UniProtKB/Swiss-Prot annotation:
Cofactors required: Mg(2+)
GO cellular component, one term: cytosol
EC number: 2.5.1.-
Entry binding sites for Mg(2+): D34, E221
Protein's name in the database: Isoprenyl transferase
Residues annotated to bind substrate: 35-39, 47, 51, 79-81, 83, 85, 202, 208-210
Record SUPFAM superfamilies: Undecaprenyl diphosphate synthase (SSF64005)
CDD domains, A to Z: Cis_IPPS (cd00475)
Active-site residues, as the UniProt record annotates them: D34, N82 (proton acceptor)
Keyword Electron transport part of the UniProt annotation: no
UniProt-listed Pfam families: Prenyltransf
Length: 257
């Protein structure tokens, strides 16, 4: 089972951009960007070096996803659990959104990319939050790729907050219990207005979801690779999409093939 979700080596010939464009593309690709620390450790470098290289890959994959016509690219950038890391590492991670968005924002604006953020941004340092808010504001009118960053995000907390708000709305008489449906619950989540991911990519060889979009990933195709995030390339992205295109998505029903 897990082998079917992992990166496969069925073809000796690399997948090409032209090949994947001949088939239906996933509208929403989500990525758990894992392995920055291990990448740095293998090279006897500080963990910050891995995070810096990982940021360069974010640029590269964002550009490529836009070229391919992907509609939404969701990136798990910082989880609610990541605060447990050493303070020096957390401080550096909090600088990365500012560095990334300051240098990359003009290109995002020019390329019609819309920046969105999910997560508890109120808990971010002021300088990080200001950079994020500026990017969201300056790209709010863009209509191309939605670049959705999960910052200080945890799916269980997201679901709990949605349930609390629904309970309050029932108590106030704004909702009746029979009004509570799956689409309604989705509308109370941070991802309200975004389609659920079609494809989830996780790098670094780990096979778990790490509290990321647990509700939204119900019928998402999963693709795992041993490649560490700083080593992830456009070719790996194409391989993930090609694997997705070979899947038979049944959504709990029977195969149409």
């Amino acid at each position: 089972m897990f082998n079917k979700m992992r990166k496969t080596k069925e073809k000796d010939v690399p997948v090409t951009k032209e090949e994947v464009l001949r088939h239906p593309m996933p509208n929403h690709v989500a990525i758990i960007m894992d392995g920055n620390g291990r990448w740095a450790k293998k090279r006897a470098l500080p963990r910050a070096a891995g995070h810096y290289e990982g940021m360069q890959v974010v640029r590269k994959i964002t550009r490529f996803a836009n070229e391919l016509g992907i509609q939404i690219l969701s990136l798990y950038a910082f989880s609610t659990e990541n605060w447990k890391r050493p303070k020096s590492e957390v401080d550096y991670l909090m600088k990365l959104p500012e560095q990334f968005l300051t240098t990359f924002l003009p290109e995002l604006v020019a390329e019609n990319v819309k920046v969105q953020v999910i997560g508890h941004t109120e808990a971010l340092p002021d300088h990080t939050r200001r950079a994020v808010e500026k990017a969201v504001k300056e790209t709010s009118g863009n209509t191309g790729l939605v670049l959705n960053f999960a910052l200080n995000y945890g799916s269980r907390a997201e679901i709990a907050a949605a349930v609390k708000q629904i309970a309050k709305d029932v108590e106030r008489g704004m909702l009746a219990p029979e009004d509570i449906t799956e689409p309604l619950i989705s509308s109370y989540l941070m991802t309200s207005g975004l389609a659920d991911p079609d494809l989830l990519i996780r790098t670094s060889g780990e096979i778990r979801l790490s509290n990321f979009m647990l509700w939204q990933l119900a019928y998402t195709e999963l693709w795992f690779t041993d490649v560490l995030w700083p080593d992830f390339t456009e070719q790996h992205f194409l391989e993930a999409i090609a694997a997705y295109q070979r899947r038979d998505r049944r959504f709990g029903g029977v195969s149409a093939r």
